C-alpha cells in the first residue's frame, strides 16, 4: 500500500480529481475498506480546500495524520482490578493460542502473576497447544479433557486464580462460528460465571484476527460482533505496511480498537498497539517485513 501511494503522489505535480481517484483505489487495494478509503480521501479534500496541503508530496504527511487520528483511542487495556480477566476468541488458524502464550509472557515480564484456562475444549489439540505455550511462558494452566464444558473450565480457572492471588486470568474460549446459537449460549454461560465469581473485576474480550486475510478478517469480526461483546482486536501476522489497511477499517467502520499486533514468531513478538507509531510506519519510505507467527 505504501509504495502505491508514494507512486501515485509522485506521479502528480498538483492535486487533482484524478489523484483523489487513484489514491482511493490504492487504499482499497491495500486492504482498506471502501467506506474507510472514501472517508480518508474526503478528509484530504477538506484539508486541501482549506489550504492545509501545498502539493502531492506534502499530502503524504497529511494522509498519515488523518490515519493516525482515525485509529486513535481505546487501544489501552483497561485492566486495573486484581484479578482482571481476559477472554480470547477467534477461529482456528488466526493465531489465537499463540497470542495467548505471548500475552501471558508479556504480563509475566511486567511482574504480574498470570494463570491460563484452556476453555476452547472442542478443537482437536487446542488444549495441548496451549499447554506448550503455558510452559514456554512459565505460567500455570487449568485444563479439562477435550469436549468438556468450556464454562466449567472458566469456573475452575477463576477459582484457581483467586486461590493463587493471580493478577491476570486469561481464558482461551470459542474458536468457531458455524453454530452461532451454541456459541452465544456458551459465551452467555461464561459471562454469568464471571459476573457471579468476579462481579467487580475488569474484563476484556479480545478477538484474534489474521491480518493476511484482509477484508475477510473484517467480515469475521462482524460475525463475532453478533455473538460477543468484543472490547478489542489482536491482529496477528501483521507486516506494518503490507496488511496495515485492515487496522483502519476495523477501527473506523466497526469502532473496535486494536489492542495488540503480532509481528513474529518469538515469545516477545506481541506488541501493544500504538496508533501514532503505526500510522507513521504505514507511510514511511522503507518497508519492513516481519516474520509470520505459527497458525495455532
Could you describe each region identified by the protein language model?
Residues 89-90, 172, 208, 262:
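Short beta-strand segments
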Residues 31-33, 230, 288:
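A general structural signal for well-ordered secondary-structure junctions
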Residues 129, 150-164, 178-284:
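Conserved catalytic-core segment of NTP-binding enzymes
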Residues 2-119, 126-171:
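Primarily NTPase-proximal linker/entry elements flanking Walker-type ATP/GTP-binding cores
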